[in-house]
Amino acid sequence: MRGERGQAIVEFALLLPLLLVVILGVVFVAELGVARLALEHAAAEAARTGSLTNDDDLVRSTAAAAVKPLDASLVKVIIEPTQNEAPRVSAPRGSLLRVRLRYAIPVPLGFVGLPRLTIEGVAVRRVEWTP
């Protein structure tokens, strides 16, 4: 009986790092889900703005405002086609506008050498405005 006094502490010390890594993984997966939802929502809002106006700067500012839980400075906004490309220049009504948002999310334990993961949100809308 005397040799088993510290057994529980030793078992706890051995399992604690594994438990912490599992908890960190669960939190990271939840963070990925939040980032994906935020990007999808922001892309939809930005595409809606782009379908009603012909202003890429307004589309970018709408995306930056809608991507609230994320750092807007790390979100890359890609608009296809751009403001000065066909069909948005000549006959835009009815053509498609695609807004793609990319966010490089840092991985916990990055010091191990793991790369950042890129999360993407995409939305497509028909252009409604006429020149």
List PLM regions with ranges:
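Alpha-helical assembly-interface signal, strongest on the long, hydrophobic N-terminal helix that forms
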Residues: M1-A64
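Short, conserved structural patches
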Residues: L52-P131
